[in-house]
Amino acid sequence: MKKLLLCVPFLALMFQSCSNIEDEYMYDKGLYTINWEAAADSSSVTIINRFWNETGNYFNYESDGYDETFHYWPQAHAMDVLIDAYIRTHDAKYKDCFDKWYAGINSKNGGSYWNNFYDDMEWIALTMIRLYEVTDEAKYLDTAKQLWNWIKEGWNEEYCNGGIAWNHGDVWSKNACSNGPAGLI
């Protein structure tokens, strides 16, 4: 009897919480319309205006114009924004950054695309493949192939039944960040 008395209020509360399904979607009606093309254009221009390093031809890590710290792997994601913008608009201002960036990150990274972290090289390789697909310039594909050769060196089966290590010094660390992008390459 005690169980029944406990269940009745619980069931009443549960059924009371079930209301009109329309309540769930009341925000879909929206107060304004978003122009996604304009939003994409604005963000693509902003990444150049706020993060592009005119002197070094790479993307700064911060947008303040003072911190010109270079981080290898975010370069790929920033360039992917410009690739998407170019595909969408065919505006030459985006394509003009491709070759500059290619040379800039190589120079800033010590004259090489090699990096101690396999996942970092994977992101750059994926971007190089996209650059090749958009421009048909062999240098991008050749660089992606060179990166892939370095990345494959990270494979070992001694730990975790196989996979690509996170970095050259931690062969036992098999993270999703170093194996997921490799699967895409």
Region spans (language model):
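Low-complexity, Ser/Thr/Pro/Gly-enriched N-terminal "stalk/linker" regions
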Residues: 18-111, 134, 138-161
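Generic detector of leucine side chains in alpha-helical contexts
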Residues: 4-6, 11-13, 31, 82, ...
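Residues in flexible loops and secondary-structure boundaries
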Residues: 9-14, 55, 159, 172
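Bacterial Sec-dependent N-terminal signal peptides
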Residues: 1-27
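Aromatic- and glycine-enriched pocket-lining scaffold segments that form the walls
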Residues: 141, 148-185
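Charged/polar, low-hydrophobicity segments characteristic of intrinsically disordered regions
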Residues: 108-126, 159-168
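Well-ordered alpha-helical segments within folded domains of soluble proteins
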Residues: 69-86, 116-133, 174-185
